[in-house]
UniProtKB/Swiss-Prot annotation:
GO CC terms: cytoplasm
InterPro entries recorded: Aldolase_TIM, DAHP1/KDSA, KDO8P_synthase
Lineage of the organism: Bacteria, Pseudomonadati, Thermodesulfobacteriota, Desulfobacteria, Desulfobacterales
Record field: catalytic activity: D-arabinose 5-phosphate + phosphoenolpyruvate + H2O = 3-deoxy-alpha-D-manno-2-octulosonate-8-phosphate + phosphate
GO biological process: keto-3-deoxy-D-manno-octulosonic acid biosynthetic process
Database matches in Gene3D superfamilies: Aldolase class I
Naturally occurring in which organism (per UniProt): Desulfosudis oleivorans (strain DSM 6200 / JCM 39069 / Hxd3)
Name of the protein described by the UniProt record: 2-dehydro-3-deoxyphosphooctonate aldolase
Record Pfam families: DAHP_synth_1
Keywords: Cytoplasm, Lipopolysaccharide biosynthesis, Transferase
Enzyme Commission code: 2.5.1.55
């Protein structure tokens, strides 16, 4: 059993109900961001699923210098603040430099650290020092048991409000695979809740030359497997028209597929919980 991380009226881990962290990869503008958040809130409210909205305001790790990065910290955080206040939903976004941490902590309920930066000690401890819930994305190059060292770095800042997100492991060039053993391994070795990123796990990094490709048709399959393996939450990037998304469209889930998938995940979670209770 993992720690329980409490955010307002949402409990994550420790046997609490499955949590959904979802939203567009990047903020394209206020209207589309609000529309996505409204849609997701309506669906999760109807299904009784705890919901945290996510969107990035500065994608600093795009493949190409010419790729769309987002509106930047000032406008991006203002958009997230407006969505948060209008819909009364908690918000998550990622920071990429230490200079972004302070302003982000004034708005975000959860601060996410990018997978590529999980080994950066000063960065991890600076994010953790805010006292906010921190979502550490496990690097694609990191073994599940090695995440314990990253969690320990965050703990040295006096912060135990830590989530870990599994998002696949590199498999040769331009490909990722998921080892679902990683979910219970990281839960058991760190005592922290583990979230599964079902959309970045189907990414084909750099697979289109100047940008990453993806295989969004496999998102539901991997999400179902992760919940069966005991994930405490599911992370989904969604878009009303993924083929026209300005970032990560190939691995984003169309909005119309969200409710059927979440309905299935709730059923799987219930079955897995009941089975564990009889084990």
């Amino acid at each position: 059993m993992t720690d329980t991380i409490v955010l307002n009226d949402i409990s994550i881990g420790g046997g609490a109900p499955l949590v959904v962290i979802a939203g567009p990869c990047v903020i394209e503008d206020y209207d589309t961001t609000l529309q996505a958040a409204e849609f997701l809130k309506t669906v999760t409210d109807r299904l009784g699923i705890p919901f945290i909205f996510k969107a990035s305001y500065d994608k600093a790790n795009r493949s190409s210098v010419h790729s769309f990065r987002g509106p930047g910290p000032d406008l991006g955080l203002d958009i997230l603040r407006r969505v948060k206040e209008r819909l009364h939903v908690p918000v998550l976004s990622d920071v990429h430099t230490e200079s972004q941490i302070g302003p982000a902590a004034q708005v975000l309920d959860i601060i996410q650290t990018p997978a590529f930066l999980c080994r950066q000690t000063d960065f991890i401890t600076a994010v953790a020092a805010t006292g906010k819930i921190i979502n550490i994305k496990k690097g694609q190059f990191l073994a599940p048991w090695d995440i314990t060292q990253v969690v320990e770095k965050a703990r040295t800042a006096g912060n135990e409000n830590i989530l870990i997100t599994e998002r696949g492991a590199m498999f040769g060039y331009n490909n990722l695979v998921v080892d679902f053993r990683a979910i219970p391994i990281m839960q058991q070795q760190t005592g922290k809740p583990v979230i599964f990123d079902a959309t970045h796990s189907v990414q084909l990094p750099g697979g289109q030359g100047t940008c990453s490709g993806g295989q969004r048709e496999f998102v539901p399959c991997l999400a179902r497997a992760a919940v069966a393996a005991g994930a405490d939450g599911i992370f989904l990037e969604v878009h009303r028209n993924p083929d026209k998304a300005l970032c990560d469209g190939p691995n984003s889930l169309p909005l119309e597929q969200v409710e059927p998938l979440l309905t299935a995940l709730v059923a799987i979670r219930q079955a897995a919980t009941e089975q564990a209770g009889h084990a």
